[in-house]
């Protein structure tokens, strides 16, 4: 029997499809989401409905985003869900989540078993709509969750860690083995909850500047900051900001990156 076929659907590699089948894990995720009627609940990648069904039982209506037309068509005729669902057959990377929140007149509660092949770019896309989202609960590759929660000084700490922790409180929920899926992925998974801050602990005046310096620093993570960020500020500037110019990207905290971004933004304004 082909292990890529589940409930009559052939799992498509190009969409990174692995279907969750473990009832204990499903129940744990639904309890951590704790959906309530009337909330603006959005599921990304409902697949065959492993999470959609138990969440849908608690909701009067919900929205799902599904790129696979065959899976979207199955949901359209689902016996218990079809009258509750708004199905957006579209790539989640192209969705304006702020517009969805505006249409629903409240912040969104987003969840899903995210395709591992797009999980990191999708996280960055969602962070850009953090003000329109009340919380996010995702199944991700365990390695990605480790990066989301990593502290500065660790090898897993990177640009994703900085941007996630700038925008959100990040809470790991549960680890999930490959045997919980069909077909079984080659990696371990984990569930994480991200709660966008209503007031950022370290506000920045220009998020594009924070994005720029973290990209520049972590794209050359083996270099010292004196070299990776040397085109933006001098070693003396770094010392004035209490940052060691001989340190590497992973040794700088979220707060310090925010401080550098704000300083560079203010320098830019003065130059203008």
UniProtKB/Swiss-Prot annotation:
Signal peptide: none
InterPro entries hit by this protein: KsgA/Erm, rRNA_Ade_diMease-like_C, rRNA_Ade_Mease_Trfase_CS, rRNA_Ade_methylase_Trfase_N, rRNA_adenine_dimethylase, SAM-dependent_MTases_sf
GO cellular component: cytosol
The entry's keywords: Cytoplasm, Methyltransferase, RNA-binding, rRNA processing, S-adenosyl-L-methionine, Transferase
EC number(s) from the headed UniProt entry: 2.1.1.182
Residues binding S-adenosyl-L-methionine, per UniProt: 18, 20, 45, 66, 91, 113
The UniProt record lists the keyword Transcription: no
Family designation: Belongs to the class I-like SAM-binding methyltransferase superfamily. rRNA adenine N(6)-methyltransferase family. RsmA subfamily.
Name the UniProt record assigns to this protein: Ribosomal RNA small subunit methyltransferase A
Gene: rsmA
């Amino acid at each position: 029997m082909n292990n890529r076929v589940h409930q009559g659907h052939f799992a498509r590699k190009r969409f990174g499809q692995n279907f969750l089948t473990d009832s204990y894990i499903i129940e744990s995720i639904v309890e951590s989401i704790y959906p309530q009627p009337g909330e603006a609940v959005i599921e990304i990648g409902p697949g065959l409905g492993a999470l959609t069904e138990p969440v849908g039982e608690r909701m009067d209506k919900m929205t799902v985003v599904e790129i696979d037309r065959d899976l979207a068509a199955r949901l359209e005729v689902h016996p218990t869900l079809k009258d509750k669902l708004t199905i957006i057959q579209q790539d989640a990377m192209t969705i304006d989540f702020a517009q969805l929140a505006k249409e629903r007149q409240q912040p969104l509660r987003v969840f899903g078993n995210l395709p591992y092949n797009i999980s990191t770019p999708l996280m960055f896309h969602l962070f850009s709509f953090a003000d329109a989202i009340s919380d996010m609960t995702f199944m991700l590759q365990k390695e990605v969750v480790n990066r989301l929660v990593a502290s500065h000084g660790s090898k897993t700490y990177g640009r994703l860690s900085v941007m996630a922790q700038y925008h959100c409180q990040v809470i790991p929920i549960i680890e999930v083995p490959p045997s919980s899926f069909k077909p079984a992925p080659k990696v371990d998974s984990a569930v994480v909850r991200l709660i966008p801050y209503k007031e950022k602990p370290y506000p920045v005046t220009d998020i594009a500047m924070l994005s720029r310096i973290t990209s520049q620093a972590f794209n050359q993570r083996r270099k010292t900051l004196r070299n990776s960020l040397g085109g933006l500020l001098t070693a003396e500037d770094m010392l004035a900001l209490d940052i060691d110019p001989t340190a590497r990207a992973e040794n700088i905290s979220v707060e310090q990156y925010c401080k550098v971004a704000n300083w560079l933004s203010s320098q830019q304004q003065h130059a203008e």
